[in-house]
């Protein structure tokens, strides 16, 4: 599995436009062969930072995706950014879920009072 993350920061006047373009791409990228997930996230503390995430079943699927026409639209969005993006590409060999947390901490549930819930 391969994860591609693109972190971008925009000026106030271009962020909404960039987000709108990226939102239109989520479905088409997600429907590409080999894509298991596509997400667009906006930073809750700095609303002008966007993160685009794609997860691919294989490196070959991702390479094919980079050559696709729709990737050119993402490159165009990068041109709107206030500076160069931060790019992260992780080649993941395994993924674990909450069972790892339980394995490390044991299966002791958090007390409601620890969570501020009574």
Question: In which residue ranges do the predicted regions lie?
Answer:
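Glycine-rich beta-strand-turn "strand-cap" elements at beta-sheet edges
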Residues: 41-46, 75-118
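Short, well-ordered beta-strand segments in beta-rich or mixed alpha/beta enzyme
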Residues: 2-8, 37-66
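An amphipathic, aromatic/His-enriched active-site/gating alpha helix that lines ligand/cofactor pockets
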Residues: 24-36, 55-88
């Amino acid at each position: 599995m391969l994860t591609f993350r693109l972190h971008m920061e925009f000026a106030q006047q271009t962020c909404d436009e960039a987000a709108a373009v990226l939102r239109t791409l989520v479905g088409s990228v997600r429907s590409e062969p080999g894509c298991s997930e596509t997400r667009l996230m906006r930073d809750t503390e700095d609303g002008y930072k966007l993160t685009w995430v794609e997860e691919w079943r294989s490196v070959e699927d991702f390479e094919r995706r980079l050559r696709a026409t729709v990737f050119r639209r993402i490159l165009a969005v990068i041109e709107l950014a206030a500076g160069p993006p931060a790019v992260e590409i992780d080649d993941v060999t395994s993924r674990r879920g909450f069972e790892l947390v339980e394995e490390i901490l044991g299966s002791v549930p958090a007390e409601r009072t620890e969570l501020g819930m009574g």
